[in-house]
């Protein structure tokens, strides 16, 4: 295992009674193109997952509808029986249609079916963390979906409940009903999304409020699309200049910026490349000074990056 030390903030973060290093791995890139079907080289995908463990990463974020079922199966093939300290998190509330499009699946019966998919393909008896992905267009009341996860936790299928694509009022509503250990919303230096971005809504599109709320309450915040989409240096050109200063890549600086933003931040960058995986993990050692942060943020008052922690 690599040395687990971080230049910004604590080296680990708690999710309920679980503690993990503050960079994880997102498994969305494991399947083939468009997050559909087998990857071109399944053996390479399994090698990458074993490298995740070698580095010291102990948090993997996945979902049964990645593939569908492909990410989960590759994780199990590569890593089962799992290390005792590995935390696997999944998401419920979505599904894939035959035309490869994404759709909501938030009814209690759909959530239960998704949980069973995860348990079977990951070869688990209980899932450590399950995010309820709230898609406003699903037509299913948020509380009804949440109650379904609470029931599955009481049955021993889920260890901890988390949320995804939610507003601050929804987090507050959930906390009034059950403990919440994490929130997974879109957050990155460029504010860009991707194929799932359309499932957000206006409240979620102001992520600073949710992040600050989570930080104040000790709830882990998992930024999905932590490197935006495409060339992150084109999204925020100052990243290239700061990267040259630190002998790093723009993507590494973008991850360091997230870690500097809040001690609650747990980035989960995904990749199908071992080289990029190593780079992402090494980003934890980059210390951005105040000049770096101002350059990245553009000096804009109220920019989310302007409020950082050391």
Positions of PLM-derived features:
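A short acidic, helix-capping loop that chelates divalent metal ions and anchors anionic groups
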Residues: 31-35, 95-102, 191-196, 276-279
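Acidic (Asp/Glu)-rich catalytic clusters
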Residues: 17-19, 54, 76-87, 119-123, ...
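Conserved, mostly hydrophobic/aromatic
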Residues: 25, 45, 52, 60, ...
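Beta/alpha (TIM)-barrel catalytic core signal, keyed to glycine-rich beta->alpha loops juxtaposed to Asp/Glu
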Residues: 3-7, 136-310
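Active-site groove signature of glycoside hydrolases
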Residues: 119-138
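Short, acidic/polar
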Residues: 38-52, 106-122, 167-173, 206
């Amino acid at each position: 295992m690599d040395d687990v030390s971080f230049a910004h903030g604590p080296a680990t973060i708690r999710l309920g009674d679980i503690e993990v290093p503050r960079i994880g791995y997102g498994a969305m890139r494991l399947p083939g193109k468009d997050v559909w079907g087998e990857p071109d080289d399944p053996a390479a995908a399994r090698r990458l997952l074993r490298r995740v463990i070698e580095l010291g990463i102990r948090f993997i974020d996945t979902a049964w509808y990645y593939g569908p079922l492909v990410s989960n199966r590759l994780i199990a093939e590569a890593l089962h029986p799992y290390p005792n300290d590995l935390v696997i998190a999944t998401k419920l509330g979505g599904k894939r249609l035959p035309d490869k499009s994404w759709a909501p699946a938030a009814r209690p019966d759909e959530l239960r079916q998704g949980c069973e998919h995860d348990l079977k393909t990951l070869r688990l008896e209980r899932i450590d963390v399950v995010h309820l992905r709230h898609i406003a267009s699903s037509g299913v009341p948020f509380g009804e979906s949440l109650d379904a996860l609470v029931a599955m936790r009481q049955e021993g299928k889920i260890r901890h409940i988390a949320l995804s694509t939610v507003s601050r009022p929804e987090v507050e509503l959930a906390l009034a009903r059950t403990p919440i250990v994490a929130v997974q919303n879109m957050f990155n230096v460029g504010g860009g999304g991707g194929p799932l971005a359309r499932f957000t809504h206006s409240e979620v599109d102001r992520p600073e409020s949710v992040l600050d709320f989570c930080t104040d309450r000790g709830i882990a915040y998992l930024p999905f699309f932590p490197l935006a989409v495409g060339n992150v240096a084109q999204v925020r050109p100052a990243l290239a200049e700061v990267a040259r200063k630190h002998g790093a890549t723009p993507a590494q600086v973008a991850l360091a910026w997230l870690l500097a933003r809040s001690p609650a931040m747990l980035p989960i960058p995904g990749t199908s490349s071992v080289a990029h995986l190593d780079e992402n993990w090494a980003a934890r050692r980059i210390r951005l000074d105040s000049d770096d942060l101002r350059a990245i943020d553009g000096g804009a008052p109220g920019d989310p990056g302007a409020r950082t922690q050391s």
